[in-house]
Amino acid sequence: MLPAQEYMRIWQGGENTRVPLTEVTYASDGASFTADGVTYKTSQVDSITFVHIITVTWDGTQATVEKGNVLDVDTSVSAGDVVINSTNTHNELEFVLQGACSDGSLTYTGSYKCKFYLNGLNLTSQKGAALEILCGKRIDLILNAGTENVLADASGGEQKAALYCKGHLEVEGSGSLTVTGNARHGICTKEYLQLKRSTGSITVNSAPSDGIHVGQYFLMNGGTVTVSGQKGDGIQTEILTLDDDITPNPDKEYNGQIFIHGGSIDVTVSGDDKKGVKSADKMTISGGTVKVTASGAGSKGISVGKHLLINEDNATTLVEIRATGGVYEDDVTDDETKCTGIKVTQNMAITAGTLRVANTGSGSRGIKVDGVYYVGLGTTVSAKFTKGSVKTDTIPPMD
């Protein structure tokens, strides 16, 4: 990708073709145009949008920004720290981030959807987040094929994560991303986090709090996610609320939920009362591999705030949980909680797939379901349900 280029997207039937503006010529009567050697009839084109590419390159201690003549975008650079403010509300911006810097960062503020391509980026901040996207719209994060990308934030500061997105973060691309959290979370999104089928690998290797912390919901269709070294939970969702900080926001769909439809998750969590995967609401595993190793008093492999459904949609499902630990007693409330492989607050249904849960430690439990649970024919389940869990012969309500 060349820096600071303008492109045209030609939309037909929901699909689009992107061509450089320099490769577009128009017929004198306006009935057609030729883009990159292909002629289009104007009447057969659904719409046309324009894209401007901005390239940010870090080289040692200095960053440079190539933005050409793009309008409504202000940039400032101080050594390796880059701040970009956009008031653009009509053309989609695309940013290519590349190079290496041990004292650098990027903070982007805008109010329109945009894309960030990580093209071999190795960025460590000494002041705050490495990559902070302050835009509440849809943000596409593309891990360019064949690239390794590394982000780490400062050990101090008020940043929420090494990689923080205020909006809806959708990840794709077959490259890799390794994140080190030094202040709070490794990766944090205020709205949903979605990993598309084409996603490569994402690794969070440490964080003082959660490895991956997500508002609204977490949706995984592909990719490989590895989380370890965090002192909080491995992957956690939260329910977005209204201004009273109590009432769930009714406008946020799938609020607090986790969906695993494909890919591979491997989470290691260690510490008292910590969870490998924690869903604030319902959780659905319908494909892929989920492996969690949890150790510590009161630790949980998977903790679900409402219902848990395990089935198979378009891919095989394998869930393996290992939980080791005893009973945790809260110093303030004196409440006790036991180490548990899977803890479900409401109902649980296993209609397809393979589930293995192993638990060790005094008072530890395999699976604890506060509602009722169902195990369908043809499933492979190797786990012990606690005596308080009630089995049913029909699939229980999962709404």
Residue ranges and their predicted role:
Residues 20-30, 38-51:
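Structured surface patches comprising rigid loops and adjacent beta-strands/short helices at the edges
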Residues 9, 32-34:
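Residue-level detector of beta-strand face positions
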Residues 52-399:
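A composition-driven surface/loop motif
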Residues 9-18:
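C-terminal trimerization/auto-chaperone modules of long, extracellular attachment fibers and adhesins
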Residues 14, 35-37:
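Glycine-centered tight beta-turn/hairpin loop motif at sheet-sheet or coil-to-beta transitions
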Residues 4-5:
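Boundary of Sec targeting at the N-terminus
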